[in-house]
């Protein structure tokens, strides 16, 4: 079966929800917990971080009776809520919105960025904050580990990209941005490692393993809100606030080459998050101002939409790519099972 055949078989099934945050869910990361079970961690505008105990294979159903005043004629009088996990531990320390999270490869260390201008390094097994990083002069928006996890990258509203060691010491600062540093993505292509950095000035800078800027994708009129890449490190997916998605060659040096831009997609809706997964070939997920969308790269309309919970701000897959997690502005996290019927 060809890739073209497989990609048309992808779909999502709603599994259930996670409830525990008192504010919008802004960031999601998923690693591997005990016995190989997915370890989901979320950050929120309620200033907290939650480690979740997932019960994906043993959901709990609740029947919620609706207030008679809220029921329109002919509508159901009750709804079924399916819970697929519960908060295992809440991590507190930030005194403003938690804006971004990054988890290391063995799921033992977490870094969090906050609008309180700080970064925290957490030990996941003990759920304790190990280090407080201070240095940004304004809200911190984005965070990422370097490929070897010896350094931490952070970007903020002070238009700076900072490099830290795990002791909380600033090793280098890049002030070449003309707008907020909104998103950071670690990319590996063969033996080469890159850091892609998006800004509200509309530009994306590609940094090499020496952390010097190797290439800049020029800025446009609209802010870059999210970045994603394929597993092989060939293509970079850039989401802009106005709803444009660009698919670019990561290693092309000449940003003006026509061949550099593989695809430009106009979705017509504000984008908060983008997530591409190579397993599903031409399929990518979008968190938008209205909800969740699943799209094909060459498709003009969404293949799947969920607009029940308002804006979708965060997206992640579990390690097996069996589940998609989406964080919403109403504080809920929805869980979807990926169905790839073309797989044998």
Feature-to-residue mapping (PLM):
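Conserved strand-to-loop turn within each blade of WD40 beta-propeller repeats
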Residues: 43-46, 113-116, 154-158, 198-201, ...
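Residue-level detector of Asp-centered blade-edge/turn motifs that repeat once per structural unit
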Residues: 32-36, 105-106, 147-148, 188-191, ...
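Blade-level signature of beta-propeller repeat domains, shared across WD40, Kelch, NHL, RCC1
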Residues: 313-344
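A short beta-strand motif characteristic of beta-propeller blades
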Residues: 15-18, 88-90, 128-133, 169-174, ...
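WD40-repeat beta-propellers
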Residues: 49-53, 119-122, 161-165, 204-208, ...
